[in-house]
């Protein structure tokens, strides 16, 4: 049976961790599906990981659709989530709905992910009202890397931390059914996870999120040129073993440890957030 957003809400209620992995092809999707990974994210990170681009901004809708089709063919139980690429939803309501629907109709994805907060809440509402599950993404949002000044931890001071909380509330109110928090301080992610009714998925955001996500190539140590602080290599000899180790460590709370997290907020500052 295909996993669903309802089942992920139930996991949050039961305090059971959700596992997500970014992958881009049929073979890796089969491994993840057989390893009982909850969600396979066809991330726009494929622009850098697979296509050798410098950032995620150049990948197109047509390219994302091709890779999503491949993953959908390999995933029988895992929920397939597709990243909407840069400017495929920001430009207009019409583009947002039409492009989201293409992922469902043409690539057989089960939902879509978008980056941003209050500024795209109206797009989230339109897509979700059309019957498509929407996952939001806050913190370090790679599509806004030029505005953020690079790939840096977000929410390190009172103003920026409060902005992320306000955005999180806004996307939930707009109809998002899950939220990815990338590279925010552990205590901020913990506070957001406690405030929201929808599940949070962390990457570089600590162990208190309702689930975790890593890129398939990163958790297996396949990219020797990249090793972010939040990445842990599990096993590059046997992908199935590596994925299952990742799954088990997420579910048991072993991963991520403090070693793979960022913490810039003290308790005094945290108490001022609402």
Swiss-Prot record:
The active site is at 182 (proton acceptor). It is found in: Cytoplasm. One of its GO terms (molecular function) is 3-methyl-2-oxobutanoate hydroxymethyltransferase activity. Its EC number is 2.1.2.11. It comes from the Bacteria. Pathway: Cofactor biosynthesis; (R)-pantothenate biosynthesis; (R)-pantoate from 3-methyl-2-oxobutanoate: step 1/2. It catalyses: 3-methyl-2-oxobutanoate + (6R)-5,10-methylene-5,6,7,8-tetrahydrofolate + H2O = 2-dehydropantoate + (6S)-5,6,7,8-tetrahydrofolate. Its cofactor is Mg(2+). One of its GO terms (biological process) is pantothenate biosynthetic process. Binds 1 Mg(2+) ion per subunit. Keywords: Cytoplasm, Magnesium, Metal-binding, Pantothenate biosynthesis, Transferase. InterPro entries: Pantoate_hydroxy_MeTrfase, Pyrv/PenolPyrv_kinase-like_dom, Pyrv_kinase-like_dom_sf. GO terms for cellular component: cytoplasm. Mg(2+) binds at residues 44, 83, 115. 3-methyl-2-oxobutanoate binds at residues 44-45, 83, 113. Catalyzes the reversible reaction in which hydroxymethyl group from 5,10-methylenetetrahydrofolate is transferred onto alpha-ketoisovalerate to form ketopantoate. Belongs to the PanB family. Homodecamer; pentamer of dimers. This is 3-methyl-2-oxobutanoate hydroxymethyltransferase.
